[in-house]
Amino acid sequence: MNPYLQQLYNIAQKPVRHILGLMSGTSLDGLDVALCALRGAGPNTQVELLQFSTVPYDAALKAEIRQVFAKREIDFQHLCLLHPKIGILHGQMINACLQEWGIPATEVDLVASHGQTVYHAPKTQHGLAEYGNTTLQIGDG
């Protein structure tokens, strides 16, 4: 089996999985970081919130994101460069939270992140019957 799939399989078999959930939406206020313990599987899954913090975005990062945020015309090179930068910054923010909480990174099984939302295209806006609501997120890493 692929070693990465094997690792995911092994995590799924654990009685308790520690998962970091990230949320960074259109308000651009910062990154919400939630550490949860998951027990069980399927409809019997139980979730316990262990820690939560919001790490604010500084003014420079907000300005950089706003250059590509919710615009129909953007500099795609800037978008491409911002894509890994957001991932790296989110990683640094995660590490700061873990340090603040006194939790070693080795105790985290997974990080669930959709990235930083930069564009919403709801069906009411694009008007295409064959497509639903859609969004674009960045934050590779």
PLM region spans:
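Short acidic/glycine-rich loops and adjacent helix/strand connectors
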Residues: 1-141
